[in-house]
A protein has these predicted regions:
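N-terminal Rossmann-fold cofactor-binding loop
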Residues: 33-38, 57
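NAD(P)H-binding glycine-rich loop region in Rossmannoid oxidoreductase-like domains
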Residues: 57-96
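Conserved Rossmann-fold NAD(P)-dependent oxidoreductase catalytic core, especially the SDR/UDP-sugar
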Residues: 77, 103-145
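Short alpha-helical oligomerization interface
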Residues: 84-101, 134-142
Length: 158
């Protein structure tokens, strides 16, 4: 039986590390992408089963090459600026990393007919200030640039 392949984009953060550990336990081949292969988390560097892959999420040729090389069954998109507070002072990078990077992946997957699942990690920040139980159908009204960037990536992913 052929081994299942996963790519974790932005996989050196908290979600990426946890996801990679779970997938390795399920015997997946796991590729973790990062902006730089220097000074990364010890758990990532020490795990010889993980493949660490340098990737520019704004370069569609690099994305295409990654997908062609590894032919993943699933792509997890965890890349991006993750602080609502920092998003006010770094609006451009927040938008680019959370929305444009995600959009680039989806466009490359669609254009090249790659047969893989795509999971984009969203955030409760897409709903803004809400006091009720949140449902997927709840009104989406982000109150910061981070929430807006995550909402835009959520909308193009669904």
């Amino acid at each position: 039986m052929k081994k299942l392949v996963s790519i974790i984009v932005g996989g050196t953060g908290q979600f990426g590390i946890i996801t990679s550990q779970l997938l390795l336990k399920k015997n997946y081949k796991v590729i973790v992408t990062t902006r730089s292969t220097k000074n990364k988390n010890k758990k990532i560097k020490q795990n010889k089963k993980l493949i660490l892959y340098k990737l520019n999420i704004y370069n569609k040729k690099e994305i295409k090459s990654l997908l062609y090389k590894f032919k993943p069954n699933i792509v997890f998109y965890y890349a991006g600026q993750s602080s609502p507070a920092k998003s006010f002072t770094n609006k451009r990078e927040t938008y680019r990393s959370n929305f444009l990077g995600c959009k680039n992946f989806l466009e490359v997957i669609h254009k090249n007919n790659y047969n893989c699942k795509f999971l984009n990690a969203s955030s409760c920040e897409i709903f803004g200030r809400i006091n009720n139980k949140i449902k997927i159908s709840s009104l989406k009204k982000p109150v910061n640039p981070y929430g807006l960037s995550k909402l835009k990536s959520f909308e193009i992913t669904k």
